[in-house]
């Protein structure tokens, strides 16, 4: 259910602010978003998988915290990321 190594490399390359950047909020939020989307597909088939649902909620919470942090630090980077990922805000 998690992202493959190649998928992670592609996402990191797309959202990295500099070469070798894996820890910026943009990269972390992008990885969490793609992981969350993949888990949502899993729940279409497995409605009663509550153990994985807890993990999903944890990832959503972590993404929310990172987005709040980025919004407080640099609103332009925040809005660009939200727009690029297609999140609701």
UniProtKB/Swiss-Prot annotation:
Gene Ontology molecular functions: rRNA binding; structural constituent of ribosome
Family annotation (SUPFAM superfamilies): S15/NS1 RNA-binding domain
rRNA-binding is among the record's keywords: yes
InterPro entries with a match to the protein in the record: Ribosomal_uS15, Ribosomal_uS15_bac-type, uS15_NS1_RNA-bd_sf
Family matches, as PROSITE patterns: RIBOSOMAL_S15
Gene Ontology CC: cytosolic small ribosomal subunit
Sections of the chain in a coiled coil: none
Keywords from the named record: Ribonucleoprotein, Ribosomal protein, RNA-binding, rRNA-binding
One matching Pfam family: Ribosomal_S15
Record GO biological process: translation
CDD domains membership: Ribosomal_S15p_S13e
Function: One of the primary rRNA binding proteins, it binds directly to 16S rRNA where it helps nucleate assembly of the platform of the 30S subunit by binding and bridging several RNA helices of the 16S rRNA. Forms an intersubunit bridge (bridge B4) with the 23S rRNA of the 50S subunit in the ribosome.
Family to which this protein belongs: Belongs to the universal ribosomal protein uS15 family.
Subunit text: Part of the 30S ribosomal subunit. Forms a bridge to the 50S subunit in the 70S ribosome, contacting the 23S rRNA.
Name of the protein in question: Small ribosomal subunit protein uS15
Species the sequence originates in: Pseudoalteromonas translucida (strain TAC 125)
Lineage: Bacteria, Pseudomonadati, Pseudomonadota, Gammaproteobacteria, Alteromonadales
């Amino acid at each position: 259910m998690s992202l493959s190594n190649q998928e992670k490399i592609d996402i990191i390359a797309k959202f990295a602010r500099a070469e070798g950047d894996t820890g910026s909020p943009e990269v972390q939020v992008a990885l969490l978003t793609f992981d969350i989307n993949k888990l949502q597909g899993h729940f279409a088939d497995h409605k009663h998988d509550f153990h994985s649902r807890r993990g999903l909620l944890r990832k959503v919470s972590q993404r929310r915290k990172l987005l709040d942090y980025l919004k407080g630090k640099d609103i332009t980077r925040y809005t660009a990321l939200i727009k690029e990922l297609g999140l609701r805000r």
